Amino acid sequence: MKFEKIFPETLLELIRKELDNSSSFEYIEGIQPFLMKYDNVPYYVYIKNLSSAYFKDRPGTTRAQLPKKVSFDDIKKSPNIFIFLGYDQENDVFVCWDFNVVKERLNVSKSVSFYSRISYQEEVEEGEFLRINLKNGDSPIVFKRKSICDFFDKINTFFDVKSETPSNSTRPVEEDGKIKSITEEELLKQLRPLIKI
């Protein structure tokens, strides 16, 4: 597999090409990382190119590296979720790692590597979200770039959302008789194993 580096501005353009189609999306500021809102929830998003991890015994392993940045100090203190996406240009795929784990690892060393597998990046189809269970305990989600709006629509089903501000209600949000979101942690824990990702 050939890995080409894409500039930060181009990575922003690629994600915005899809997000700008959603009325739920609002771009606020920045390039990499950038601040956005989706359904009025603020997120910091940082996209890096995926490349080979150069493991001789696991040639199909890819990685995205999270560098040390001054701007990450403020993001780490922020109550906003920090989304780290690895981008595979050849397959037009994003890999997202657990944002709780990623945020904890911000600026802990010169660079922190997050891993994926090329086989999943090649096989994932549009509208599909594949969870990889890696040997290091990480369980990233792999999906097509064109599915980024669906990703944000379903973000609460992929990883636990740890809110740093108390919520007024834990009741499910209903619209037209359909449950649109569930925020009650105990119920979410029971439902997650039943949801096919």
Predicted regions and their residues:
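Intrinsically disordered, charged low-complexity linkers and terminal tails
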Residues: 1-197
